[in-house]
Amino acid sequence: MSFHASGREFSCEVGDYSLSVVTVGAGISSLKWKGRNLVLPHKVTEVAPGWSGKMLLPWPNRIADGRYSWNDREYLLPINDRGTGTALHGLAAWVPWEIVDATASHVRLESFIAAQEFYPWPLTARLDLRLDPESGLNIELSAKNLGDSPAPYGASLHPYLLGGTTANDSILSLPASHIVDTDENLLPTGINPVSAAYDFRIPRMIDDLFIDHCYGGLQGNWEVRVTNAQGEGAALASKTPWVQIHTADALGRPGLAIEPMTCPPDAFNSGIDLVSLAPGQRHRLSLSIRGQ
């Protein structure tokens, strides 16, 4: 058994879809439809660029100064984004996950997230990836609280969808009516109706617009589409109340990060849509990615 920078890799193929997943962070390292990349790919021998494909829990996005309070106790998380002084994207993205079940169309990975001083609730995390020839890749990310007290919890994942040759010539369709305004550290300052510059309810080209924003006002089952001018690209569907959109500028804008989130940034402090995960309770986040 050999290991690489991103652990080990599992691949499967159903109909026109093919999938690869790596064991570090349970990262989706490749998803293709009719031979065309739907997400930004990377090799198992490489470190995933910009959190690409990673599972984000027990919190998505940022926690200000790494500090939060829960049940009248204060906690201090490690700061892993020095530029903003924040704790970013949880505890599961860079740890080993284990492939516990695999078939021709499905793979399940699991990971144990140990209790630590700054997050003293042990969790078991589970990722189910299932390929369907019609609906594409169906995903369920879940976690169970193994501790003896309620745990603060949120989740997301971090695929970069590909439409045009870059984000600039990609057309974005995003049915969100509100946006989270942020400060210089990308931390929330308010939730407001989306301004014209960031409104993609009518699909349009991104051009050189910088986006690193959380959107809300999503209704029921929603779908975000990223395509080229010919309508070819990828669509992500979920029913989370929030989605982070990012133009991946540090990577050269190769695609668009579409991160369905159960809560907005800094939810450990604001409490907005933060899950109180009871002992023995399992939380589930579902979504799908398809080609078009």
Protein language model features and the residues they cover:
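Extended, loop-rich substrate-binding clefts of extracytoplasmic carbohydrate-active enzymes
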Residues: 1, 81, 85-133
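Acidic, contiguous internal or C-terminal segments within carbohydrate-active enzymes
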Residues: 19, 111-153, 157-159, 164
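Short Pro-Gly-centered flexible turn/kink motifs
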Residues: 68-76, 141, 276-292
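A short, structured loop/turn motif at beta-sheet edges
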Residues: 69-73, 100-107, 130-136, 163-169, ...
